[in-house]
From Swiss-Prot:
Pfam families listed in its UniProt record: NUDIX, VD10_N
Keywords: Host mitochondrion, Hydrolase, Magnesium, Manganese, Metal-binding
Gene: OPG122
Residue span, Nudix hydrolase domain: 45-227
Residues binding Mg(2+): E132, D167
This protein's GO CC annotations: host cell mitochondrion
Name this polypeptide is given: mRNA-decapping protein OPG122
Active site: E141 (nucleophile)
Length: 248
């Protein structure tokens, strides 16, 4: 387990009862450690993302396709030119075709690579802004990324899932808190109102009963955990995100 990489896991364990056994999900670029806790005392942390695993009324899991790959974002972000070039030359398969073309022109480097078109998927959410609590952060991020008002979103706050994400390509660790929720819209209705934006290129919908990949494994763990008894919780069973925002 990567618990020693976490900045908040000791506080979470101290104040929240573990609800389910930890699992590890991994693919060729990420290793994710997930642990479910009864929500007894949770607070926003400026370095920890808050995300929602949301089910539609036609029983589909909402997932967002990022506009930029994780690797491209890291190459743009880092100021070290040697690191930029090293990441590009060694891992260009983890970029989209457009990103490879842009960086090839920028660096005047043309690495031998397969003709794949990388797309990284995430659940809607992000890092809370200063002064935001969990409901406010989720409301803002879901609206910005998916264009869904919080009146259509219902969150199960009886429990949460702490995730430690190791990106083995850029050699960094990230933390996230997942909540399970529902959207009172069908997948088609969500597609009709969605607007591509600077962060999210498009949406995909997963079948919760079958699939593969990291996003499916995360969702399966979360949905299985939602069936457990959350004794001692201080949350709500699918409360309106709008009401949670107003109450807090």
């Amino acid at each position: 387990m990567n618990f020693y990489r976490s900045s908040i896991i000791s506080q979470i364990i101290k104040y929240n009862r573990r609800l389910a056994k930890s699992i590890i999900c991994e693919d060729d670029s990420q290793i994710i450690t997930l642990t479910a806790f009864v929500n007894q005392c949770l607070w926003c942390h400026k370095r920890v993302s808050v995300s929602a695993i949301l089910l539609t009324t036609d029983n589909k899991i909402l997932v967002c396709n990022r506009r930029d790959s994780f690797l491209y974002s890291e190459i743009i972000r880092t100021r070290n030119m040697f690191r930029k070039k090293r990441l590009f030359l060694n891992y260009s398969n983890y970029l989209s075709k457009q990103e490879r073309s842009i960086l090839s022109s920028f660096f005047s480097l043309y690495p031998a690579t397969a003709d794949n078109d990388r797309i990284d998927a995430i659940y809607p959410g992000g890092i809370p802004k200063r002064g935001e609590n969990v409901p406010e952060c989720l409301s803002r991020e879901i609206k910005e990324e998916v264009n869904i008002d919080n009146s259509f979103v219902f969150i199960d706050t009886r429990f949460f899932i702490h995730g430690i994400i190791e990106d083995t390509i850029i050699n960094k660790f990230f933390e996230v808190i997942f909540f399970v929720g529902r959207i009172s819209l069908t997948s088609d209705q969500i597609i009709d109102t969605f607007k591509s934006n600077h962060e999210i290129k498009d949406l995909i919908f997963l079948d919760p009963n079958s699939g593969n990949g990291l996003q499916y494994e995360i969702a399966k763990y979360a949905l299985d955990t939602a069936k457990l008894k959350c004794y001692g919780h201080r949350g709500c069973y699918y409360e309106s995100l709008k009401k949670l925002t107003e109450d807090d």
